[in-house]
């Protein structure tokens, strides 16, 4: 018996949801029981999971089994691509951003595979197209020449194979001459208890558009680690390849696992890293690695650490640590600091541009928050703006990329005698100087606003979105600032977001801000000097191929 004959007995490829091969079994998850053949109905069947189970001993030619699995996966992928076609058309919504990346429909989360390859930028993101829930993720694919205007490409990866049928989870990309290589986590669930199985997988493309899955390249878990092992980042270091993985130890402590390889296909475990940080969260996600001004950094997403301020109640954090890579490949980590002090920033990825800049973007959301007003229109979440990173005089600096200046429309001249203005748009760039004790309100109308205030007594900056249409999540973020006479803010606003770069990029605060479509006013109390203001044009919609 071949795998193809099993598929036929189970109603054909159009009746197949997924194929799983745990232990010595072959599990076929189906859509309709009535389409099973009489022989298939004699096999063990789980009514709850709609799964038919065969023993692998029924396979006559074991040598062809692996190739047949990949071929079946490709057939399932072809069907999935047909099924998602209606969901690639963007739905209209008053909260749709003018110049940020958002999904046409469904749910967006982590950016993936952010890289410059063969003359253009590639950016992928986690996407579930059907509804606004976290489930069975795809890799959506965009390309750009300028990091501002993005073009939709065919979906790169679908959850179609035995090693990733419950989600092609996050990962990174490597550019090797003409070859674009995607490393990602394959997620699988087994049984009614939904036991998690994760492997680190590879897909390759010679044209940068169409990808062929190669299957797992790290098929086993690191020693002492739970199946919470994901998000591979591959780097070149000391003439060999290293893979960084976010993991959870069996004692539920987050750590970084590191592997090495000579050929990008065979990987050997080196070590778990991060003990010097102590008990630092129950899971680390989405590692990244880069060097700024001769200092190595690793980005981690520690879940469950202590929040930097009392108003931050979410367990999900993102930050950067200094890294010292030993010759063995093991990393010593120190000096964790948040990458963003706002509400909505997670799972960042970075790349190096041809002119040597380090550019980062992130998911402008958090894992547990999906009930946004846009969900009523069938989509949720967006990515942050692109930031340029530098390391100067011992400080990490983040600034908006210079390419954003191409979006500037006619400068807006605001009277120094007025304290309230109607910009007639939520898409704008604003440079202001605020004295302590002053308040700035944005996205304002009679129905609400978002407030930025400087508290003189505590020397803290607050962003307060409690007077907006927010449905879940924190409403206030705060951070301490160094002693100064004034605070310089460089603000980028879109239809439903604000990103505030503080004191020439010493800190950033990002926020999704939902207000009604007429909330286009700006006002302030106290000593606020508006230094420059531009309305921003729309970027190319990231849904158009």
Curated annotation (Swiss-Prot):
Residues engaged in binding substrate: 107-110, 126, 169-170, 230-231, 285
Keyword set, alphabetical order: Cytoplasm, Glycosidase, Hydrolase
Reactions catalysed: Hydrolysis of terminal non-reducing beta-D-fructofuranoside residues in beta-D-fructofuranosides
Main location per the UniProt record: cytoplasm
This protein's GO CC annotations: cytoplasm
Active-site residues, record numbering mapped to chain: 110
Claim: Hydrolase is one of the keywords in the record: yes
Name recorded for this polypeptide: Probable sucrose-6-phosphate hydrolase
Subcellular location: Cytoplasm
E.C. designation(s): 3.2.1.26
Taxonomic superkingdom: Bacteria
Alphabetical GO biological process terms: sucrose metabolic process
Short name of one Pfam family: Glyco_hydro_32N
Pathway assigned to this chain's UniProt record: Glycan biosynthesis; sucrose metabolism
Homology family: Belongs to the glycosyl hydrolase 32 family.
First-level EC class: hydrolase
Entry function: Enables the bacterium to metabolize sucrose as a sole carbon source.
KW Cytoplasm (keyword) present: yes
GO molecular function: beta-fructofuranosidase activity
SUPFAM superfamilies (UniProt xref): Arabinanase/levansucrase/invertase (SSF75005), Concanavalin A-like lectins/glucanases (SSF49899)
């Amino acid at each position: 018996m071949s795998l193809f004959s099993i598929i036929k007995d189970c109603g054909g490829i159009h009746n197949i949801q997924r194929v799983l091969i745990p232990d010595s079994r072959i599990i076929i998850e189906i859509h309709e029981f009535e389409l099973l053949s009489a022989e298939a109905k004699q096999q063990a069947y789980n009514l709850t999971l709609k799964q038919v189970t065969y023993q692998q001993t029924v396979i006559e030619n074991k040598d062809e089994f692996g190739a047949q699995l990949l071929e079946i996966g490709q057939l399932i992928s072809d069907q999935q691509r047909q099924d998602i076609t209606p969901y690639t058309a963007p739905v209209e919504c008053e909260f749709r951003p003018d110049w940020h990346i958002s999904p046409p429909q469904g749910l967006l989360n982590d950016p993936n595979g952010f890289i410059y390859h063969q003359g253009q930028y590639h950016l992928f993101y986690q996407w579930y197209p059907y509804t606004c829930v976290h489930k069975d993720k795809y890799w959506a694919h965009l390309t750009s020449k300028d990091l501002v205007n993005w073009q939709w490409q065919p979906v790169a990866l679908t959850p179609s194979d035995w090693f990733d049928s419950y989600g092609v989870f996050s990962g990174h990309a490597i550019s090797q001459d003409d070859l674009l290589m995607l490393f990602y986590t394959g997620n699988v669930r087994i049984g009614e208890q939904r036991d998690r199985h994760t492997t680190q997988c590879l897909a390759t493309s010679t044209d940068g558009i169409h990808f062929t899955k190669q299957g797992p390249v790290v098929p086993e878990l690191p020693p002492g680690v739970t199946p919470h092992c994901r998000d591979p980042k591959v780097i070149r270091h000391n003439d060999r390849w290293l893979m960084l993985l976010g993991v959870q130890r069996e004692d539920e402590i987050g750590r970084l696992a590191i592997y090495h390889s000579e050929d990008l296909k065979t990987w050997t475990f080196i070590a778990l890293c991060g003990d010097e940080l102590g008990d630092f969260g129950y899971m680390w996600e989405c590692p990244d690695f880069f060097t700024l001004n001769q200092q190595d950094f690793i980005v981690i997403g520690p879940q469950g650490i202590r929040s930097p301020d009392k108003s931050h109640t979410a367990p999900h954090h993102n930050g950067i640590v200094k890294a010292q890579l030993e010759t063995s490949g093991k990393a010593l980590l120190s000096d964790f600091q948040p990458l963003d002090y706002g509400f909505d920033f997670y799972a960042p990825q970075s790349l190096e541009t041809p002119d040597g800049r380090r550019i980062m973007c992130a998911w402008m959301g958090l894992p547990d928050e999906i009930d946004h007003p846009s969900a009523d229109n069938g989509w949720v979440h967006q990515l942050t703006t692109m930031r340029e990173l530098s390391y100067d005089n011992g400080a990490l600096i983040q600034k908006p990329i210079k390419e954003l200046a191409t979006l500037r429309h006619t400068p807006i001249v605001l009277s120094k005698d007025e304290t309230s203005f109607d910009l007639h748009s939520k898409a704008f760039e604003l440079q202001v100087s605020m004295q302590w004790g002053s308040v700035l309100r944005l996205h304002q109308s009679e129905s609400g606003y978002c407030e930025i205030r400087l508290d003189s007594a505590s020397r803290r900056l607050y962003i307060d979105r409690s007077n907006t249409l927010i449905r879940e999540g924190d409403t206030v973020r705060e951070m301490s600032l160094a002693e100064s006479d004034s605070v310089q803010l460089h603000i980028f606003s879109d239809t439903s977001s604000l990103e505030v770069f503080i004191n020439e990029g010493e800190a950033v605060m990002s926020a999704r801000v939902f207000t009604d479509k007429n909330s286009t006013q700006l006002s302030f109390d106290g000593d606020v000097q508006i230094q420059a203001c531009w309305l921003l044009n729309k970027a190319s919609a990231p849904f158009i191929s």
